[in-house]
Amino acid sequence: MFWKPIVNLLEAEDIEFLVVNAQHIKAVPGRKTDVKDAEWICNLLRHGLLKPSYIPDRNQREMRELVRYRRSLIQERSREHNRVQKVLEGANIKLASVVSDIMALSSRDMLEAMVHGETDPETLAGFARRSMKRKKEELELALKGTMSSHQRMMLKTMLTHIDFLNEQIIELDMEVAKRLAPFQKDLDRLDSISGIAPGTAEQILAEIGTDIASRFPSAAHLCSWVGLVPSHNESAGKRSPPKHVKATNISDPHSSKFLTP
């Protein structure tokens, strides 16, 4: 992100600037120097041929960073859950075959007991709550394993890391909610769309902002910007098969796509 420090300085001095995709301003092949490149860019600017990339204001950029960082922590937490499952499998403990979430309250109590040295399947199954109590026999069979001191240490470290990630995610949730409070009506409208959860609504607002009309003349422009429009390539009267633009992260202003599964 070489453009960010410069943009921050220019923005602080209230100087108008353009961030332009380098692929859109390539000069004619030949002798290439920094001076010639500068002259070429100046000529393009004088003739109005520079197409600026969309650079949100500082508030929205900060909002994007918060939402993206939260997303990365959530993904890391999921990876840590998978590591816990791998440790359990290595200890021949098949907890996931009985419970749908090994990080639910009952399962977490069982894991904590394992960390503290508990190995008796009946005792571990006794931590089951509510509907899980009906699966006590299955739990006892699934919890018959052999956990070494090494695996116990690994499990303890992973659970500690998960707790830390949970705390950080909650803190980010609070900050995101505070910053988006003035746009609650927009969030509610997005949340009313089938398939869009509150977290997704927050991400959409953070990425495209609320002043969409000033940036995108139509819905088609917005769809193209996020990479949902097939490309159209034609040469000598022949059309190549359409391909959707690959959606990437818009932390790069020249690769301004953000919708990911």
Q: In which residue ranges do the predicted regions lie?
A:
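A detector of single, family-specific signature residues
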Residues: 1-261
